[in-house]
């Protein structure tokens, strides 16, 4: 098992705007510049929180965003989106149950990442920095 965090923050350390928006992210870097496609091609599983999933829903077709991975959303709500499974509980315990032969991408957010970091379960942090200043927002590390 290998657990990765791959994401982008602003120059002032935020991974999302104050209202959890990611508009700033969509305006920076192409897939070629960020090596996103290469990274994603090696992943088996994505993990994300509800707010990250809500941003993905705004695309209109969330299943097309992560079409080749098993996708889990930590939430206490039901999901009606094909290709995504709602889960709850401790992210570290959940990851332990996924199996050894998996490449797991923690898409976001910090409430999913922090417990995994606390238990030294993250094998690789890939943090890209966008030339953007938000002034306030949701930090990657709290």
Describe every region a protein language model picked out.
Residues 1-142:
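Enzymes that bind and transform nitrogen-containing heteroaromatic metabolites
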